[in-house]
Each structure stands twice: as structure tokens, then as C-alpha cells.
Amino acid sequence: MSNNYKNPTKVITGPKTRWSYANVWDPKSINGGTPKYSVSLIIPKSDTTTVKKIEAAIQASYEEGESKLKGNGKSVPSLKVLKTPLRDGDLERPDDAAYADSYFVNANSAAAPGIVDADRQPILERSEVYSGVYGRASINFYAFNSNGNKGIACGLNNLQKIADGEPLGGKSKAEDDFADDDDDFLS
């Protein structure tokens, strides 16, 4: 059931998006702030469709949020000088191979995201979703002006896991660690 209204600030990423720093089951507090659910979405630079959708949503958020961005000032700051969520992994994470040849967006929310599998069935087993899986994300962009900081932020709505991936963060899966039989165990 789809309605005809298309929210210009909402994006569904492509299926090759990789999830990193996936705090999607329990909210996490950063520097004593409000606990939030969050994920870093790693988008291959080759996924130009998703990148263009994100750029358009950032522009729409800027236009919708001009009064908020203006605040008490006389004019709205240019989008070029504002903090925006689409970032270049090659420039900002040069030592992390997972971010090579990719853009990334950090999305968060105070509310838990819905998490489904490729067949749109809810995922209830926490071990199924980890940093390194591939999937689509429903995200929205919005303007903010808080404590002198102005920009466009990214909210996390829902996640759809499409495929398993190599776990990120150096932790291996138990089934991989013990995959090889040690024939000379007792010798």
C-alpha cells in the first residue's frame, strides 16, 4: 500500500550499502548525550543512484529548514559552509579499508529502527545484524540549529538486511574460527 506523496527528504539506500558501528538493538550514549540507535552507512561510490538521492534529500532539507538555519541571523548560511552528513570515506577514513572508494552517512534516532530481512520479515535474532552486513536503510534528512551548530543531519528510520558480510571491527564469527577440523588433535 503506497501513497502518492513522496517525501523529498527521505531516502532508501541501495542493497550494496554496508552497515558499520551498528548500534541498532540498544541505544548508546555518546559523550553523555541522549542514548540513540545509530549506524554508519557505507555507500560505494559506484552506487551513483543512492548518492544522487542523498544529495537531493540534503538539498530539500536545506530548503525546508531555511528558517531554522537562519535562526537569529540576517541570512541563511550557504549549504556549502554547513555541516552535511554525506562524507567521503577516502578523505575522512583513509586508514579503514571498509570505507575505501565509498561515501558514508551516520544515521541515528531516539526510537529503535524496524529491522527486516530480504523478505521483509522482522529479524528478532540479534546475531543476524552486526557491523559488516549489507542492506538497505530508510533514512531521512533534516536541518538543525543547536548550540551554535548548524547543518543537515540524518535520521534512521528502518533497516533491511540483504546479505551477510565480513564482520567489521576485528571480531570473527565462532563458526568461522572453528571451521577447520584439527585432525591431529589427540596425537
Task: Spell out what each predicted region is.
Residues 1-104:
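OB-fold ssDNA-binding interfaces and closely related basic DNA-contact patches used
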Residues 40-42, 106-108, 160-162:
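Residues in well-ordered beta-strands of folded domains
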